[in-house]
Structures are given as C-alpha cells and as structure tokens.
Amino acid sequence: MERVCKTEDIVEQRGMVDANDMADTKRTMTETLSRLYDHRKEAGALLDLLDGEGKITPLIEKGVQKILERVNGRIMEDDPFFAYFYLQLDHQLRTDIASPTASNFKGGRYCLYINPYQFLSLPMEQMKNAIKHEILHILLQHMSRANILKKSYDSYVVNLAMDAVVNNYLQDMPRDAITVPYLNERFSLELKPFRTLEYYASKLQAAYDQLKADKDGQDTQSQEVDQELSDIEGESDQDQGGDPVEYTFNAERT
C-alpha cells in the first residue's frame, strides 16, 4: 500500500535539510573568518612588548600561544596530520636560538622551541611552514641521523642537507630558502628532489670540499672564495651538538 506523504513528514525533512545547510554555512563562515584573521597587528603589539620588557613575561607567553593556536588552526584546514602532531609537542619560547623555530628531544618528549622575535615577524604562510618544517625533521629522524653523518661530514653541510630534504615537502618557500633548486644554483650542482639525507650530504660535501680546494689554490686572491665559504656556513644551521635542530627559514628572506 502506497504511503501517503503527510505535511508533518515534509516539515520534518525540510527541517533536517535546513539544519544541514546551517551547519555547512556555519563551518564555511568559521573557515572564512579564520583565513581573514590578520595576525600582524597582534604580533606587532607583542614585539613592542618584548622590546619594552626585554624578557619573556607570562603576558607575552600567553599572547604568543594565542597566535600559535591560530596558526595551527590554519594548518588544520590544509594538513590535519601536521596540526594534530603539533598538539602532541611540548612548546617553549626561547630567545637564544638563531631561527624562528627549533626542535629537540628532551625528557622523553619532542619539544618545539619558538623564538618570538623572529617568529612573530613572519607572514602567516611562513609561520605555518616553520612549524611543519620542524615536524618533518622529527618524522624523518634527522636528529639521530645527523649525529651519525656529522662524524663524516661538516656540520653545516649536514644541516643544509636536512633542510633540503624537508623543504622538498613545503610550498610557498622564498626563492633563497634552502631548497634543492637553491642549492643547485648555489653550488652549480644537479641535485634531484625527494632524495635521502645521506644523498644530499654526500653531494654537498663534495661541492664544499671543492670550494676549499679552490681557496687553497688561491693564496693571494682568495677573498671571493673566503666570502663564499662564509656565506655557506652562515646559511646552514648552527652546530649546537645536542641542542635543537633549527629551522633556517630566515625572517628577512621574504
């Protein structure tokens, strides 16, 4: 027997549709507001406060944490895996690291370090990349692998190689960030993308050794080569032994 569609059924179905539409609309509005959020004013105020206080106060720490939550919310929209991984990390503000972010294994947990002076100066996309960069270092076990490689290779070469590996997976990088194309141009190499840390370290060490050999062969006119070597060592992370693996995305490179 054919069921007669009652008015109550129509109203109920229409209510379900409206509820779903409202939920979708609310979700869309939330995402839109998140993308419209401009962190620069808030970050600028915190930087002014940092300059005035000369140290990290509870108020500054709370403000930076709020911005970090916003940044992770943006990461959640595009890469939920990275966002959830970020939530599992300890977080600590430090002003004694040379990069916006750094990471280390401490007390049985991974810790993400934030240099507020540098991190707060970054655009939103670079903030996202800085966090994802550190997570990739952790996932690829770069800390333990680097300790082994540094027994055979120069520390700055290994650091360049680590950054080349992780930056393969990141987008919207500045032209002179430590990427495979950048290193190819810098060293006149033909490195392939998405290769191992050991591959990049080996190739970069050979190029670096050649530069040093060129320097030794130019006793009187070696200023240019000296500058080249100095620039290379300055581009890589600082060798800090057991200290954090640092993210080399310089705030000035925009």
Identify the meaning behind each predicted range.
Residues 1-129, 135-254:
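Short, functionally important secondary-structure microenvironments
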